[in-house]
């Protein structure tokens, strides 16, 4: 029987759940009090780094999004410390946050397609 997921994929899924819970319940910074969705986690093969892709409910202002990503990256050591307590890993990866704008791009494409169908 072959494995469907390798270890880094399983750890990425678990990190996604734990980081979403930490952001929602443990971060008390009022500057990021908005709905934050952890959309994807990519873990390096040696599990030393994790890239966390997040999207925000209010993501229309690019400067606000950059500030929120900066705040999350500054809080990454605190989030990593909480992850060390909640996960049984020998090495908890360093965390780097990135903005995931795929939902906005998909929404823009669907609006363009909708306008094209209305013109026909």
Curated annotation (Swiss-Prot):
Subunit details: Monomer. Binds 30S ribosomal subunits, but not 50S ribosomal subunits or 70S ribosomes.
Citing just one GO molecular function, the answer is: ribosomal small subunit binding
SUPFAM superfamilies attached here?
Ribosome-binding factor A, RbfA
Protein name per Swiss-Prot or TrEMBL = Ribosome-binding factor A
InterPro entries the record matches: KH_dom-like_a/b, RbfA, RbfA_dom_sf, Ribosome-bd_factorA_CS
**Its biological function?**
One of several proteins that assist in the late maturation steps of the functional core of the 30S ribosomal subunit. Associates with free 30S ribosomal subunits (but not with 30S subunits that are part of 70S ribosomes or polysomes). Required for efficient processing of 16S rRNA. May interact with the 5'-terminal helix region of 16S rRNA.
At the top level, the lineage of the source is Bacteria
Q: Which family does it belong to?
A: Belongs to the RbfA family.
The uppermost taxa in this organism's lineage are: Bacteria, Pseudomonadati, Pseudomonadota, Gammaproteobacteria, Enterobacterales
Annotated GO biological process:
maturation of SSU-rRNA
Which keywords does the record carry? Answer: Cytoplasm, Ribosome biogenesis
Q: What is the organism of origin for this protein? A: Buchnera aphidicola subsp. Acyrthosiphon pisum (strain APS) (Acyrthosiphon pisum symbiotic bacterium)
Subcellular location per UniProt equals: Cytoplasm
Q: Which GO terms describe its cellular component?
A: cytosol
Does the keyword Nuclease belong to this entry?
no
